[in-house]
Amino acid sequence: EPVGSPFIHVMLANIPPEIGLDTLRHGLDAWEKYTGVRPAAGWNPECGWASFLPELYREAGFQSLVMDADSFFLSFPEIREATGLSYDVQGHSNKNHLFKIEEYIRDKPEFLRYLTNPSAAPNGLNMIFRSDCMANPMLWYLMGATEGMRSEPVSPGEIRAMLENWKSRIAASGSFIMPYAEDAEYIGTSAYFYVKQFNQARFFEPEPSSVARFRELLDTATSLGYELSTPSEVIENAGPPIENDLIEQIENGVAWHGGTAKAWANTEYSRLLDPVCRSIFDGIALLQKRTGGRKELDDALKALTSAWVSDSRWPPLPTSPGRFNVRETLDDLYRANGFLEKAMEKAGIRELRALYSPELMRTQIRCIEENLMSRKYFGEV
């Protein structure tokens, strides 16, 4: 089953909802254009959270959304206290400590049921929860890497034991589990694994053995009696979803892996780029009101959305984004500003620079360009 997402990998919780809605629809349009299928299930990049997201996905046309269970569980004071986990916008994540959540809820059906049943947001959007308590060991298994204190990689036997443990939990509390919902690029490459886990400048190295290991995951699951299913199938077969208004207690600005979406908004790159993005967005909104819908304004919105991509703002110190990521965002800002200039010309309001000044904005983009391009980026020698 295809799973839709924003066309541009943006942190939806950190940008104007209007931008988020447009790129969600753009993503669905792209799926339909190239495959003939319009996804019903949705993915939220990095599972960043804000209260408006269920409404955003519903308005875009999604019927269901994959949710992060760890940030949901950490919204319960008793789980936060039992695990000792906390959030900090300067922290990278709690990824390798989220097993503490599993240790606390493993014999508590009142919590397990959110992992083993679909639930419904107050607006009717169906939700399926994923957790690092299963996904993280599986990721380390796929990479064949060692985990901090470990001397040996995660073994097939450990994966089998984990799946066996969850069989009884599913039977006691629901009907399914979503064990692995992670970045797809880890199946075939190392993606940013070594950057995130070891602060090493190793990007997207080929990992062909991870493909074979992924097959082993599937074979192990089916040998234990698991049946493979899609998000829409488990929702259809599970009966009435749990009415879940507790999602309104998830902290604004958190994300998956026990991290925060606000970490992306608090890097030095975001602090330079985001005010410029916001100024251009305000210009688009003002010109839309003044001139009505124009193609140039939609082009500007698409270019601005691309400029808000998460990868030009992340990862935080001691690493950094890639120079090419930041360069692309700067180019997108120049393009968005150029489209606004054309929109004003075609509307005959070029001289009304109290509305928006493309000339002045061009110098502002150049100012941050000089700052950002003069830096040394992670991995550069």
How does the language model describe each region?
Residues 1-16, 23, 40-44, 63-68, ...:
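Short, well-structured secondary-structure segments
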Residues 46-53, 72-76, 237-240:
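Beta-rich nucleic-acid/ligand-interaction surfaces
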Residues 12-15, 73-82, 137-139:
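Short, charged, surface-exposed secondary-structure boundary motifs
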Residues 20-46, 118, 166-171, 176-180:
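CE4/NodB-like, metal-dependent polysaccharide N-deacetylase domain
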Residues 64-91:
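Catalytic or ion-translocation cores adjacent to nucleophile or general acid/base/metal-coordination motifs
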Residues 41-51, 185-186:
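Gly/Ser/Thr-rich loops at beta-strand to alpha-helix junctions
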Residues 55-59:
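Hydrophobic, small-residue-rich alpha-helical packing segments that form membrane-like cores
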Residues 83-89, 93-137, 143-150, 154-381:
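Active-site and substrate-binding clefts of carbohydrate-active enzymes
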